[in-house]
Amino acid sequence: MPKQITGETTARLKHQDVPEAEMSVRALLQAGLTRAKDSADWSSISAATRVVLPAADGPMREVITGRSIRPTGSYASRKAGRPLAFESMNERAVFVHSEVDTRVANYLSQPCRFEFVLDGVRRSYVPDCARILSDGTLEILEVKGDRRDLDDVDYRRKLDHVAQACRVVGWSFRVVFGAPLRARTIRNATVQLIQHHRLAQYGAKDVFVVHDRLAAAASPLPLGELARALGNEVVQTAAARRGNA
């Protein structure tokens, strides 16, 4: 049975009547652990592995302490409905792209903690981010600058253990490299411009216009055409820049 700990007590999943893509990250983490309790594969590693969840919806820990020499900050996410702390510009880049990526329904920084024994040594690992995709898949992400950050063999073995635990529970685990997301490209510039207006206000009429145009279209519509339907010059500018790529 998976060792699932919320705060100092074991949590039990309440019945969910909402689609997985609409659940909170913590609720979906909890659901996966509950489903895994009858898995023979999980029982083979659960004796030395447990997943600790935060006591409430939100990050496992706040990373901004004022003592770190690394660039830290907070990203105000409309999609997550809360500010998300980051420990590097690579993590921030993942947040920015997650905010714009329509495949991402929700996401959260520092979502849980894995505790396990590897080679007789107690280990602890906190993922950089967890994302819920539109199809209900839960992704656990480790964010690195590039492949050179994985040169340490012991660290790779640590990630391999976490990846194995995720597969057994039914989560996806992958390493995301931030360097390509921060490169000076037209695509990244467009993502930056769009996310810059992520907190813009819109009403039911705007949503209706977009749904109406998409439903009537025989193929995917360019962003610029939707922007013209809304009369939004800022988004039109973003579309024009993207079109000149």
Which stretches of residues belong to each language-model region?
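Electrostatic, structured charged patches in enzyme active sites and in nucleic-acid/phosphate-binding
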Residues: 1-245
